Regions:
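Glycan-processing catalytic domains of CAZymes
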Residues: 1-297
Length: 297
């Protein structure tokens, strides 16, 4: 994952056919992309190795999800045991990265057992040369800013920084500046080798851009699919200005749409996102770290 060869992911946990959002990607963008798969999300806690390896056998470039903010919640969030995680890392042929998604590490107690799990997952990623995408936001906490101030996390992140991408998951409209500052600070301080941005459609709902423009309905309320298509790409632009090399879109349910009965195509939101990514790649728009640091006063 570099500025010359950025990386972007699209989630794969909707009712669409598995891999549909990758199949309809323009050919020139496929080498930069991966889909979210495996068995750390929405698949329940049983047969985690088999589910992950079955997904790998489909042949799609993919990203797996080893843990979240709890061991199991309604079969949706699942923590993958470390021996299983290592077997996946050692055996998978098409795995491109491991993501820690909405893991809320910054607000955990110092002796929380998940802290040790986090450290070991980062170390395993370094052992097998797989990027670790720490992707979080600020769900009622200033989480990213807290992570980069705590040695329980920063010590291992700094040691394995070549494999660490610190990414802001835009799941709230408030506290955005602190999150941008956190990922930039992690990059400047050597805690992360690269940084990223994950656009999330709920952000605009939280900011009041749904149903009736300017009307605030509260978090996770209203119809987020009514946001203008260009907003999807707009959410990624701060990452470009910061030198981010990783970009992610949550919610392929609004990035692709049915065409006829069994085919898919990208929606206006998806087209806006792909157009931006193509421009960034073709015109080498991602600034070098030195350029970004030179703008800081």
């Amino acid at each position: 994952i570099t500025r010359e060869h950025p990386f972007f992911t699209i989630f794969d946990h909707s009712i669409h056919r598995t891999g549909a959002e990758y199949d309809v990607l323009p050919e020139d963008l496929k080498e930069y992309a991966a889909i979210m798969g495996g068995a750390g999300w929405s698949n329940g806690p049983e047969g985690l190795l088999e589910k992950n390896m079955s997904f790998d056998e489909l042949g799609y470039p993919w990203v797996t999800h080893f843990f979240s903010h709890a061991e199991v919640i309604d079969g949706k969030y699942v923590i993958v045991p470390l021996p299983v995680a290592e077997q996946i890392l050692a055996s998978a042929k098409n795995l491109k990265a491991v993501v820690g998604l909405e893991i809320y590490m910054g607000v955990r107690a110092e002796d929380d057992w998940v802290n040790r799990l986090y450290q070991r997952v980062v170390m395993l990623c370094g052992k097998y040369g797989i990027p670790f995408l720490h992707t979080d936001g600020n769900r009622n906490d200033i989480d990213l800013a807290a992570v980069i101030r705590r040695p329980v996390f920063t010590d291992v992140l700094r040691e394995y920084s070549d494999y660490v991408v610190f990414s802001y998951k835009q799941n709230h409209a408030n506290a955005s500046y602190s999150c941008y500052g956190a990922i930039l600070g992690a990059w400047m301080d050597g805690i992360a080798g690269n940084i990223g941005i994950q656009a999330e459609n709920w952000y605009w709902n939280d900011a009041g851009f749904c149903d009736d423009i300017g009307g605030y309905h509260g978090y996770l309320q209203g119809n987020e699919q009514q946001i203008p298509a260009v907003f999807s790409a707009q959410m990624l632009l701060p990452g470009l200005s910061l030198g981010a090399c990783y970009y992610s879109m949550e919610g392929e349910g609004w990035l692709i749409q049915m065409r006829g009965t069994d085919e898919y195509e990208y929606s206006p939101q998806g087209i806006a996102m792909l157009s931006l990514l193509r421009m960034m790649i073709q015109h080498h728009l991602i600034p070098a770290k030195e350029e970004v640091l030179g703008q800081i006063r």
